[in-house]
């Protein structure tokens, strides 16, 4: 199918002295997306191919964001995204018992710096990032295995990489990976990708500027309590590990932050999917000497 969307938003700074919004300090975002998706007949009927052309314009006016190197300026993001997916999970999308889900996603911008003679090493950040350039690869896979009747094992593997065409510019401050916590991205303005890792506080496994590569594996044992049309409820236990890194040179795929825990999910057609997880993080939170320990996560909506 074909889809088209246009959106805009404004974010204002909060003046703590007057306890009011300061509209002189603002971030304006406008964007548009044109997309096309289709089901493929080859290699089999479970494949889908989605493509989209996306544009975002960020205008900062005396506005501070931790990942940006400037408070005043404009950044433009024109990217082309291709998503090849395969979904054979069934029989129900709420509680799959068999099959798998795969997605390989590539997101690329034009390599603007190849077409001009600018001295990017000495350019200020607001000019260096006026037209964002990067390429981003994501892989996500899930397998569902029926152990016994309503007891299901869900195995999950993920990988993401954000790269740069020009080392003088470096990796974009936008579109980075933030690992840890419940995985719900709310109030984020820099295109970041938030990855859940239960047993750790939100985004705690990523540096201040954001990661450029991440990987994650998880195993979730699910047991259906009730699967009625009015409400589906299942309990789960999980083991998972993941991490993010500031550069591909630092990437150590087996250096994972590990956790385990249990939770419950409730799906009601009127409210969607709701859940709560209790996770224990076995490893230290970066920048501290403390093991993460017990964390509580509230889940709203389907993940991935």
Ranges and model annotations:
Residues 231-237, 248, 252:
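Generic long, charged, amphipathic alpha-helical segments
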Residues 1-101, 273-274, 279-304:
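Gram-negative/organellar outer-membrane beta-barrel architecture
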Residues 226, 242-244, 271, 281-285:
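Short Gly/Pro-enriched loop/turn and capping motifs at secondary-structure junctions
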Residues 222, 259-265:
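Short glycine-rich, acidic/polar surface loops and turns
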Residues 8, 42-45, 90, 147-151, ...:
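Short coil turns and loop connectors of transmembrane beta-barrels in diderm outer membranes
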Residues 198, 242-259:
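Outer-membrane beta-barrel transmembrane domain signature
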Residues 66-225, 237-238, 245-247, 288-289, ...:
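C-terminal outer-membrane beta-barrel translocator/porin domains of Gram-negative envelope proteins
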Residues 4, 14, 49-53, 102-106, ...:
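Membrane-embedded beta-strand positions of outer-membrane beta-barrel proteins
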